[in-house]
Amino acid sequence: MDNSKAKIAVVIPAYNVENTIVKVLGGIPKNVSSIIVVNDASRDATEARIKSVRDDRITLISHKKNMGVGGALLSGYSCALGKGAQVVVKLDGDDQMDPALMPNLIDPILNGQADYTKGNRFLHPVALRSMPPVRKVGNLALTFLTKIASGYWNVFDPANGYTAISAAKLAALDPRRIARNYFFETSMLCELRKLNAVVMDVPMPAIYQNERSSVRLPREFFIFSTSLIARIFDRIFSRYFLYDFTAVSLYLILGSLLCLFGGIWG
């Protein structure tokens, strides 16, 4: 299949990335049809830097209020679908994702091998050495919980934000079910499972710049934990009660009742 004529859109959520956004935009491959940059109410010169880039493919969306990475992406995704994109790639504006690796994400979708592709830094053992130990441990824990919540047991590194999705699956997603914060990627996986989407991991190096992260770790850890637990229960309910009812459903009911009685009278 000739993928050179496919309509590819790249969505870039941009928040306080004045030092890197121009380089990121300059590195996007020429075969990309549309570049949609969402300035999520940056407090620095991000918007001015975006406007300084002369590229007719660029569409700038400016949020007056910060909507979070998920909110920014949903704005960009909607715009990409409106432009008739076949595949939509999500690329961060902090220069931690190599645009040259984009074909590795796009080709499996165009060739019918996957509906959604994502980077996996754990499949790149040499570059993985640059990942801080705290990130490794946190990512392993997050991966395990995400496997339970989403049902994608073959997927690793769920927080990796370098992704691509087919227009068909993107249009089928319910945006109301997608998180607006840094739980965005994980919530995408959970919702894609409901659509029986094929998800594929793509080896990708871990790149870390000297940019200061805007993530508040204690707050985001609490949000991730509670959101994952909620998604786990949502998956159990959807799979064993809403869409089907099997012997496992009965076991879950009986087991829950026994635990309840044991907790009260045990």
What feature does the model see in each segment?
Residues M1-S4, R177-G266:
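Hydrophobic helical membrane-anchoring modules
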Residues K7-A9, S34, S187:
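Cell-envelope/extracellular polymer assembly enzymes that use nucleotide-activated donors
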Residues Y15-K30:
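Short, well-formed alpha-helical segments that are part of the catalytic scaffolds
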Residues N19-K23, D44-V53:
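Acidic helix N-cap motif at the loop->helix transition within catalytic regions
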Residues S33-S42, I61-S62, L91:
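Short beta-strand/loop segment that forms part of the nucleotide-sugar
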Residues S34, R57-T59, N154, V198-M200:
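Conserved beta-strand segments of alpha/beta enzyme cores
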Residues N39-A48, D95:
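A conserved acidic beta->alpha catalytic loop
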Residues H63-G82, V87-V89, P99-Y182, Q209-R219:
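Acceptor/aglycone-binding surface of glycosyltransferases and processive sugar-polymer synthases
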